[in-house]
Amino acid sequence: MLVLALDSSATASVALARIDSDAPGASAEILASYESEDTRSHAEVMAPYAAQVLADTGLDGAAVDAVLTGTGPGPFTGLRAGIMTARTLGFAWNKPVYGLMSLTAIVERAFADGAFRDSRTAANSGMNRAAVETLVASDARRREIYCALFAVTENGYSLAAGPSVGPAHQTHAPAYDPSDPAAPALGYGAGLYTEALTASGWDVLKDYAHLHPTAADLVKAAARCGVKNLSRDTQALYLRESDAKVPAAMLARTASAQPPHGQQNTGEQQKTRGQQPAPASPAREQ
């Protein structure tokens, strides 16, 4: 089956992949992919990237079997761009649209590379326990991280907790026997706050401390999980309210400037009679 994947939780990326089965444990062959390192141009590039991966493979939307979108967590504007593009394409092509948490892409990359077998964390302790509890983090700005905890075994991984947002120094590693090595931490957010996470008991894997979620890794994670097991819920995981809100002080000044109830509007006020104020941006996409 052909799956078009999009993720805009950090950078903007699109990938077209052929998955050999919709059952768990499948593999994905990336046919074409594009990624922008610019974390602020998502709205401008997502649709063109989708068109380009199809053009590169000589296909069109009719050939696509499903659309996959990363659901975050991520900043409001960027994350919304990818999700809305995925929904629009799914609607236009009459194809199912699936959602998968974006941080899954990072743990997929590390797992596929054998990081948990080769790192000192896994070699010394990870596969001797039922699972290695692994932190995956991305940059939430404001000196915070978006993060989730995954349980990693020899056979795969699963979400153990999260996602959540908060300061890195408040993200404490699970308490293991003192003889155990520290639990691993991955992702760009881990690289930004290596010192704070190390002090909190994590072992930041340097080879994976630069990673952002990508559409290519996301679709590989979807194949491993099984497309038939994916959720059709594409609700965005913003985790905190949008910055694009009118300040409370400005709202108060606006309210105090309104004419008393029952007073007749004149001039410019008459032109706007009946218009409703724009609603504030929601904290979560419906």
Language-model features and meaning:
Residues M1-P73, R284-E285:
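N-terminal beta-alpha supersecondary unit
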Residues E37-V45, F76, R80, M84, ...:
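Residues at secondary-structure transition points
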Residues L4, A15-A17, Y146-F150, L237:
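Conserved hydrophobic/aromatic positions in well-ordered beta-strands
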Residues L68-V97, S102:
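DPxDG-like acidic metal-binding loop motif
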Residues V53-T57, A92, A110-D113, A215-V227:
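Stable alpha-helical structural segments in soluble proteins, enriched in small hydrophobic residues
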Residues A23-E29, E35, S41, P96-H212, ...:
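Surface "functional belts" at beta-alpha junctions
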Residues K206-Q263, E268, G274-Q286:
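Acyltransferase
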